[in-house]
C-alpha cells in the first residue's frame, strides 16, 4: 500500500503555513479543523449503533469488549476501557484495552510493535479469547498490521468484530463485521493522527462503551447509578443522584446510602418503594440490575 495516498497522510491545503502563523491564528486553524470531526462522526452513526448493539450482545452473553490498537489508537482504547469500572461499576477485565507493544507502550513508543500481525493474534490468545467476545480494532490509517492480525484471528474464532478507521474502505474495515469510518480529512499537521483522527476515535469509543452500558442496565435516566463512590467527590455525586432521582432531601439520601454501602441503585429503589436494603437488592437482582424495570414491576 502507498501510504501517501491515504487521506490521513495527505497535506492539508488550509494549514500549509503553520510555521509562519502568529499564535492566535495558529490555534484558530487547529480549531477550524476540529469543528469537522463531529460531522464526520455523525455520518457513521448507523454503524456506531450497530457496534453498540453488538457490544450489548457480547456483554449479555458473558463476553467482553476488547479494544486493540497501536500508538494513539491503542492508548485511546486503554483509556476508554480503564474508565468503565469506576463509571459503571463493572469488573476490571470486562472492557479490555490492548496496545501494540504492551503496557509500556502507553508511556513510550515501542518501535515496530504495530508491524506484526502475529502480535495482534498473540495478544488475543493471551486473553483467552472466546467467541462471545466483541473485538474492536482501532487504526486511524486503517492498515495497521497488529490490528489486522487481531481482527482476522477474532473472526476466525467466531467473534463479532468492529473496525474504527479514519480512511475510507480500509484494510481493517474489510476484516470486520462492522466498519466505522469517520473520514475527518487531512490533519492540520500532516500525518499526525493524534489530532482529528484521535478525536474522532475517542468520540466513537465514548458512544460504544457508554451506549452499551446504558443498554446493559448501568444507567437510570441519565445517571450513572452503578458508579463506585470511591472518593469524596463521588460520594457527593452519589448523594446528588439519589436526591435528583427521587426528590428526597440530602440527609435522607445519605441515610439510605449508608445502608447500601453507598450503592446508588438500591438507595433509589428504597426511597421510591419503601423497601429495605436487602429487599431492594433482591428486586434489582430479579430484574438483572435494571433499575427502571425494578421500579415498574
UniProtKB/Swiss-Prot annotation:
What does the record give as its pathway?
Answer: Amino-sugar metabolism; 1,6-anhydro-N-acetylmuramate degradation; Amino-sugar metabolism; N-acetylmuramate degradation; Cell wall biogenesis; peptidoglycan recycling
- One term of GO molecular function: carbon-oxygen lyase activity
Per its UniProt entry, what is the enzyme's top EC class, as one word? lyase
Q: Which gene encodes it?
A: murQ
Q: Where, by residue number, is the active site?
A: 83 (proton donor), 114
Q: Which SUPFAM superfamilies match?
A: SIS domain
Subunit-structure text: Homodimer.
Q: Tell me one GO biological process term.
A: amino sugar catabolic process
Name of the protein in question: N-acetylmuramic acid 6-phosphate etherase
Residues of the signal peptide: none
- What does the UniProt keyword field contain? Carbohydrate metabolism, Lyase
- Other information: A lyase-type mechanism (elimination/hydration) is suggested for the cleavage of the lactyl ether bond of MurNAc 6-phosphate, with the formation of an alpha,beta-unsaturated aldehyde intermediate with (E)-stereochemistry, followed by the syn addition of water to give product.
Annotated SIS domain residues: 55-218
Q: Does the keyword Lyase apply?
A: yes
Amino acid at each position: 500500500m502507498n501510504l501517501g495516498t491515504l487521506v490521513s497522510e495527505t497535506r492539508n491545503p488550509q494549514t500549509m503555513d503553520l510555521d509562519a502563523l502568529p499564535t492566535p491564528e495558529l490555534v484558530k486553524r487547529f480549531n477550524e479543523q476540529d469543528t469537522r470531526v463531529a460531522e464526520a462522526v455523525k455520518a457513521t452513526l448507523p454503524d456506531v449503533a450497530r457496534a453498540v448493539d453488538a457490544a450489548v450482545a457480547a456483554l449479555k452473553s458473558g463476553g467482553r469488549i476488547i479494544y486493540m490498537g497501536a500508538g494513539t489508537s491503542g492508548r485511546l482504547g486503554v483509556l476508554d476501557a480503564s474508565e468503565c469500572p469506576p463509571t459503571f461499576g463493572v469488573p476490571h477485565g470486562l472492557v479490555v484495552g490492548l496496545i501494540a507493544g504492551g503496557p509500556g507502550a502507553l508511556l513510550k513508543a515501542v518501535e515496530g510493535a504495530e508491524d506484526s500481525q502475529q502480535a495482534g493474534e498473540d495478544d488475543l490468545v493471551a486473553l483467552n479469547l472466546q467467541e462471545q467476545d466483541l473485538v474492536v480494532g482501532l487504526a486511524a490509517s486503517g492498515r495497521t498490521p497488529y490490528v489486522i492480525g487481531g481482527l482476522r484471528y477474532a473472526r476466525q474464532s467466531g467473534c463479532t468484530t468492529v473496525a474504527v478507521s479514519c480512511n475510507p474502505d480500509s484494510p481493517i474495515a474489510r476484516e470486520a463485521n462492522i466498519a466505522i469510518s469517520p473520514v475527518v480529512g487531512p490533519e492540520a499537521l500532516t500525518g499526525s493522527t493524534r489530532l482529528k483522527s484521535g478525536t474522532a476515535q475517542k468520540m466513537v469509543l465514548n458512544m460504544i462503551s457508554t451506549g452499551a452500558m446504558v443498554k446493559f442496565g448501568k444507567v437510570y435516566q441519565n445517571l450513572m447509578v452503578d458508579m463506585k463512590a470511591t472518593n469524596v467527590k463521588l460520594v457527593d455525586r452519589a448523594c446528588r443522584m439519589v436526591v435528583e432521582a427521587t426528590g428526597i432531601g440530602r440527609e435522607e439520601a445519605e441515610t439510605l446510602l449508608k445502608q447500601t454501602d453507598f450503592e446508588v441503585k438500591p438507595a433509589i429503589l428504597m426511597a421510591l418503594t419503601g423497601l429495605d436494603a436487602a429487599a431492594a437488592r433482591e428486586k434489582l437482582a430479579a430484574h438483572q440490575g435494571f433499575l427502571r424495570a425494578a421500579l415498574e414491576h
